[in-house]
Amino acid sequence: MAKKRAGNRETESSPLVEQEPRPSKETPVPKGAQSPGGASARMSILLLVVIFACSACVMYLVFRNFPQLSEDEREKIKIPKDMEDAKALGTVLSKYKDTYYTQVLLAYFATYIFLQTFAIPGSIFLSILSGYLYPFPLALFLVCLCSGLGASFCYMLSYLVGRPMVYKYLTERAQKWSQQVDKHREHLINYIIFLRITPFLPNWFINITSPVINVPLGVFFLGTFLGVAPPSFVAINAGTTLYKLTTAGEAVSWNSLLVLGVLAVVSILPVCFQKKLQQKLE
């Protein structure tokens, strides 16, 4: 009898051993939750550090080809953290801009893209600085191009190594934004432009979650290039009076905020009109 009971226990317990674990309904696993190659969050961080180190080496080479600077000038060549740093940097760059035009432009271009790619604060000061260093049309094109390229590089970086981190630390926010993107899938460029003009979502969040929720790279770049133009217009215009500013907040006036609000509404109007037209036709 004892043997028979033992046999029954083994037969009853065996299906439990062989049964495959099912994912919990409370924490659904997102589609494609693993990055290519099934890299873990730890491996992704390691790859990110390696890519950052390589990019920093490129930045070092760019600034190594900079003209010979005095000791005092060398101390001012750094990523601006406040308006005083931006003024000091503007003084040095304006001195060498005419003689070493290509080197200064390349250094500005590379630095802006570097900051955008790795979501490092400071690009707002470079936008203001462009208005001080260059003619307005060139400054606006330069800032829009750098923002578009830098954000696209951040997008690709997130696509390659950032997915595990997004799923681990930003799952809930990414899922909420994914639902919003699905609602505007037919008018995604207008939606990206609207988000870039308005402060509803941080730019770094848009950059790193867009590849995870399947925003196409082409749409992402174009929406960013066009969407950053209005805020950049304000910053560049403020750069013409750089030395009168004491903080970055002074670059934005009530008039400029009103203009940005109007442009944000204009960017989303075609979507509203098309939806109303579709409702009437139906």
Curated annotation (Swiss-Prot):
What broad class describes the main subcellular location of this protein? endoplasmic reticulum
Looking up InterPro entries in the UniProt record yields: TM41A/B, VTT_dom
- Annotated Gene Ontology MF terms? phospholipid scramblase activity
Source superkingdom: Eukaryota
**What GO cellular component term, any one, is given?**
mitochondria-associated endoplasmic reticulum membrane contact site
Reactions catalysed, as given in the entry: a 1,2-diacyl-sn-glycero-3-phospho-L-serine(in) = a 1,2-diacyl-sn-glycero-3-phospho-L-serine(out); cholesterol(in) = cholesterol(out); a 1,2-diacyl-sn-glycero-3-phosphocholine(in) = a 1,2-diacyl-sn-glycero-3-phosphocholine(out); a 1,2-diacyl-sn-glycero-3-phosphoethanolamine(in) = a 1,2-diacyl-sn-glycero-3-phosphoethanolamine(out)
Localization recorded for this chain is: Endoplasmic reticulum membrane; Endomembrane system
Fetch the Pfam families from UniProt: VTT_dom
Q: Where is the region VTT domain? A: 131-242
UniProt entry keywords in alphabetical sequence: Autophagy, Endoplasmic reticulum, Lipid transport, Membrane, Neurogenesis, Transmembrane, Transmembrane helix, Transport
- Provide the phenotype resulting from gene inactivation: Morpholino knockdown of the protein causes severe defects in motor neuron axonal outgrowth.
Region (Disordered) residue ranges read 1-36
TM region positions: 43-63, 102-122, 138-160, 188-208, 216-236, 251-271
Q: Name one GO biological process term.
A: motor neuron axon guidance
**Membrane topology label:** Multi-pass membrane protein
Query: Which family does this protein fall into?
Result: Belongs to the TMEM41 family.
> What role does it play?
Phospholipid scramblase involved in lipid homeostasis and membrane dynamics processes. Has phospholipid scramblase activity toward cholesterol and phosphatidylserine, as well as phosphatidylethanolamine and phosphatidylcholine. Required for autophagosome formation: participates in early stages of autophagosome biogenesis at the endoplasmic reticulum (ER) membrane by reequilibrating the leaflets of the ER as lipids are extracted by atg2 (atg2a or atg2b) to mediate autophagosome assembly.
Free-text domain note: The VTT domain was previously called the SNARE-assoc domain. As there is no evidence that this domain associates with SNARE proteins, it was renamed as VMP1, TMEM41, and TVP38 (VTT) domain.
Q: Can you say what this protein is called? A: Transmembrane protein 41B
